[in-house]
Amino acid sequence: MSNDKKNAFPIKLTHSAADQVKKLISSQDYAEKLDLKLRVYILGGGCGGFQYKFILDDQVSNDDCVIESNGAIVVVDPMSLQYLFGGIIDYYEGLEGSKFLVVNPNAKGVCSCGSSFNI
């Protein structure tokens, strides 16, 4: 994977999100797979029309965009990237639980749960 592709990635990860990714990867469940990255992708569905999905993945395709941000690596496929361009991924902990959140400048509307959006 070229450094140009890695450096051109248009999504940022907050320190809180990066810390959580590193914590998850170093947990006992993934101790033998330290090459994991946070894959962020978009699926149709949810009350807003599109949903954000997050998984830990050790696979990177040639057409994936990859960035290292605050010590964690994020991977996004080209289709999802068009919807996430310029976004910021954060990690939130509150009374109702904890989750990754996306601040997406492309979203015209976001549902109250924050997990789905429309364009």
Swiss-Prot record:
Encoding gene (name): erpA
The protein's name: Iron-sulfur cluster insertion protein ErpA
Sequence similarity: Belongs to the HesB/IscA family.
Organism: Blochmanniella floridana
Subunit structure: Homodimer.
Binding of iron-sulfur cluster, residues: C47, C111, C113
GO MF annotations, alphabetized: 2 iron, 2 sulfur cluster binding; 4 iron, 4 sulfur cluster binding; iron ion binding
Keywords: Iron, Iron-sulfur, Metal-binding
InterPro entries: FeS_biogenesis, FeS_cluster_insertion, FeS_cluster_insertion_CS, FeS_cluster_insertion_RrpA, HesB-like_dom_sf
One Gene Ontology cellular component annotation held by this UniProt entry: cytosol
UniProt-listed GO biological process terms: iron-sulfur cluster assembly
Signal sequence extent: none
Source domain of life: Bacteria
Function: Required for insertion of 4Fe-4S clusters for at least IspG.
Matches recorded under Gene3D superfamilies: HesB-like domain
Cofactor: iron-sulfur cluster
UniProt cofactor note: Binds 1 iron-sulfur cluster per subunit.
